[in-house]
């Protein structure tokens, strides 16, 4: 069984997918509560997701650039004293701890033309507010 999201991996599309044998997919369609109480992904988003996969498959130079840019940003933020949650993805959670601080920082960065979102409880555990 392979599952994935179109929301985070493919530039803000919506929905997700499960790939498996026909038997398992049929079982999930009939038993999975989230599937039973949701709508199918619209064809336009399926097309956008397929195109994003197509572009990503042929964009090794862009992936390499993204990886290098992510490493550079991580290094710069850490050198400036920020704590960055570790991980292999280009999403860099800047750990701030305080929810009010995360909100203020997100607002200030937006005023400077940098779009980040502040996350705090209940989205993340108490004391682990962050921006990303």
Pin down the residues of each PLM region.
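Active-site C-terminal subdomain of aminotransferase-like
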Residues: 1-88, 101
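A common structural junction motif
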Residues: 36, 111-116
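Beta-strand->loop->alpha-helix junctions that form or flank phosphate-binding loops
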Residues: 40, 117-122
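Conserved PLP-binding catalytic core of the aspartate aminotransferase-like
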Residues: 64-73, 78-113, 121-123, 127-131
């Amino acid at each position: 069984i392979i599952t994935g999201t179109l929301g985070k991996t493919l530039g803000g599309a919506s929905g997700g997918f499960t790939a498996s044998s026909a038997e398992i997919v049929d079982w999930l369609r009939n038993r999975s509560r989230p599937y039973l109480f949701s709508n199918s992904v619209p064809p336009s988003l399926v097309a956008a997701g397929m195109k994003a996969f197509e572009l990503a498959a042929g964009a090794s130079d862009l992936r390499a650039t993204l990886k290098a840019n992510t490493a550079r940003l991580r290094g710069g933020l850490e050198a400036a004293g920020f704590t960055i949650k570790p991980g292999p993805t280009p999403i860099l959670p800047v750990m701030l701890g305080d929810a009010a601080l995360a909100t203020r920082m997100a607002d200030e960065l937006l005023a400077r033309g940098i779009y980040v979102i502040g996350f705090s409880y209940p989205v993340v555990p108490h004391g682990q507010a962050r921006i990303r």
